[in-house]
Amino acid sequence: MLAAARLRISYPAGSDEDGNSWEALDEMRPLSALTADPADLVRLLDWGPGKGMEFSERARPAQEVIAAAPIRAVHATAQLREVMTQFWHDHFNVASGKDESTAAFFPAYDAMLRGHAFGNFRTMLGDVARSPAMLYYLNNADSAASPA
């Protein structure tokens, strides 16, 4: 069902503040971020000098998760799992559009919630609290205890 799904990505040619440029794009792509290794998606965060990338490319992983939700809801054989996954997304909300850091980790966050849909709540809560998507969303990615 998801293997045949495509999502449009479209943006004009442009450049960033460092002068890195990109060509205009308008194409239909498969939902490849859903099964991508999170380490591969981290490259979307490395967009410094010499690595110009349009924002739509960095936001793409989260957009794919959002696009996949209704497809799974309609076509999944385990529809109750989809309902519970959406419930946990609503309960442990991570605004995927907050920034590109959250977006890059959103497919892994979705997979984690999906895996815990009917599991142990305490285990899921621990995984949510340590999730890179949640840490970026809460601005806790670089948080550390004071040496007091």
What annotation goes with each model-predicted range?
Residues 1-148:
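A contiguous strand-loop segment
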